[in-house]
């Protein structure tokens, strides 16, 4: 396989709202990131993946973009971004952005035009359909955030499609004008000097609407639609166009969020020649825990890792991760965040880090941050939880049962503020944090672990050095000779 800079890198995901607050308004920001660049450099980071910082009304914490070429006011200005980019490069690190192009915000100018009338030139930039004869939704597909994928718009008497929240209408990728606008925007960022994109929800841009209504599982109002809205036939043509008109023109790092891709069809996604991205985030290993059994299935985990490593060997590259902004903390779900907290944090780190691929660390993972101790359903900020809460409440259901359902697996668990010190609010802010800091910040924080040579943080530093050593880095081949009941 070819040697590339991104194969030798260690990446770190920053969720800006929760990383570091420089002006004490309770919200992390871009200047706050600059303040912590030396920390990331000292940790051994080569690439920073910055979650969305674009202008957004924040229905889904920035994944609902209203302007791709402007900065969310809470995070700073474009001047602040330029300074962040410059300071990152000055330290020999690279910066990649989160690219969300399956959908926009309903406050994006494109959608405002699209919904204004059926005759608007941008009407076909989004997905519109007439109601059924009884006035109901065009089909019975379920949103990833619960409820219907369709929202009725009274102005034009049609429904628009939203795979995520109703404030995140899906772009119509079958329209070539949409694709051209997206590629033009991507190239604008590349010309500014960014080093790549992590492309959000990219397997969802192609839908098979011809499938119509789907079987509705017992106890549900709508039908899960992953089989018809994820990695559908024809998607590779659009991704090839993205590669031809944008990605292939720059020395960049590209990562596709590729839910629904399996090792058998991964070659067209990440193959050295025909692949559309350098690497992908696949979720098969994370899905093992969400089956409903909170126990960690070592054998199944091992088998999944084996399959991805073996089937991509010599063909494509793996993106290695166990946490991100959408996942709960692994020390709490796959391990024991009390008695065996240290062992849980470090053992899982070794297993995923030393496979062949580029490892990603999610902020706070390197100090063993844990799930938040939720005590009421009203505490949640996650739009998926809030949507189901409203549905259950409107139907007269037991909203208290949602707490047991979501307290371990909600997305807020990974979005609590970074724990820098044992001072008020964990050193994240001197103001009121946008979301409560985990109460265990007094014992789990960067400052304390920096002084302890045997801490989780210093374990990660040693692990990163090992990953980068001449004996083990890029050319590491994966083998697993352990007995079936052992992970390695």
Where are these regions (language model features)?
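Hydrophobic residues within beta-strands of alpha/beta enzymes
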Residues: 48, 197-199
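Short, polar loop/linker segments at the starts of domains and inter-domain junctions
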Residues: 20-34, 295-298, 335-341, 428-434
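Acidic/aromatic-lined carbohydrate-recognition and catalytic surfaces
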Residues: 2-187, 191, 204-262, 418
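Conserved alpha/beta catalytic core and glycan-binding cleft of carbohydrate-active enzymes
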Residues: 106-140, 239, 243-417, 422
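Conserved small/polar residues in nucleotide/adenosyl-binding loops
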Residues: 478-485
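Glycine-rich phosphate/pyrophosphate-binding loop
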Residues: 149-161, 165-173, 411, 416-466
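Active-site rim elements
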Residues: 169-179, 226-229, 330-343, 404-405, ...
């Amino acid at each position: 396989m070819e040697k590339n800079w991104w194969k030798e890198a260690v990446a770190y995901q920053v969720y800006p709202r929760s990383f570091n607050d420089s002006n004490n308004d309770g919200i992390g920001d871009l200047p706050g990131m600059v303040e912590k660049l030396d920390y990331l450099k000292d940790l051994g980071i080569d690439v920073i993946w910055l979650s969305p910082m674009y202008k957004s009304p924040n229905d889904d914490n920035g994944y609902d973009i209203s302007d791709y070429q402007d900065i969310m006011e809470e995070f700073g200005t474009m001047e602040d971004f330029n300074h962040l980019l410059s300071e990152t490069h000055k330290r020999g690190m690279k910066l990649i952005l989160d690219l969300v192009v399956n959908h926009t915000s309903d406050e994006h100018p494109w959608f405002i035009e699209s919904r204004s009338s059926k005759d608007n030139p941008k009407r076909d930039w989004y997905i519109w359909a007439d109601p059924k004869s009884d006035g109901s939704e065009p089909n019975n597909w379920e949103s990833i955030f619960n409820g219907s994928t369709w929202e009725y718009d009274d102005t034009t008497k049609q429904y628009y499609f939203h795979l995520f929240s109703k404030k995140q209408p899906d772009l119509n990728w079958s329209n070539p004008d949409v694709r051209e606008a997206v590629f033009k925007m991507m190239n604008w960022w590349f010309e500014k000097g960014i080093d790549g994109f992590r492309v959000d929800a990219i397997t969802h841009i192609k839908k098979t609407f011809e499938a119509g209504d789907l079987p509705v599982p017992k106890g549900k109002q709508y039908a899960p639609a992953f089989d018809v809205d994820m990695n559908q036939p024809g998607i590779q043509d659009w991704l090839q166009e993205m590669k031809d008109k944008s990605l292939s023109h720059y020395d960049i790092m590209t990562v596709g969020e590729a839910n629904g891709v399996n090792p058998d069809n991964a070659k067209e996604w990440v193959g050295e020649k025909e692949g559309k991205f350098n690497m992908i985030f696949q979720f098969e290993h994370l899905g093992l825990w969400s089956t409903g059994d909170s126990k960690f299935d070592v054998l199944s985990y091992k088998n999944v890792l084996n399959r991805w490593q073996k089937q991509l060997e010599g063909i494509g590259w793996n993106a290695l991760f166990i946490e991100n902004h959408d996942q709960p903390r692994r020390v709490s779900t796959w391990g024991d965040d009390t008695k065996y907290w240290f062992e849980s944090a470090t053992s899982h780190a070794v297993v995923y880090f030393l496979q062949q691929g580029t490892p990603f660390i999610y902020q706070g993972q390197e100090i063993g941050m844990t799930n938040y101790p939720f005590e009421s359903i009203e505490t949640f900020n996650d739009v998926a939880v809030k949507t189901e809460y409203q549905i259950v409440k409107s139907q007269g259901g037991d909203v208290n049962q949602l707490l047991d359902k979501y307290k371990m697996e909600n997305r807020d668990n990974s979005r609590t503020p970074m724990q820098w010190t044992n001072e008020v609010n964990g050193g994240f802010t001197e103001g009121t944090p946008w979301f409560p800091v985990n109460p265990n910040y007094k014992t789990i924080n960067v400052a304390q672990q920096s002084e302890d040579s045997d801490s989780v943080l210093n374990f990660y530093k040693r692990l990163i050095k090992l990953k980068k050593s001449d004996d083990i880095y890029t050319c590491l081949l994966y083998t697993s000779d352990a007995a079936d009941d052992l992970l390695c």
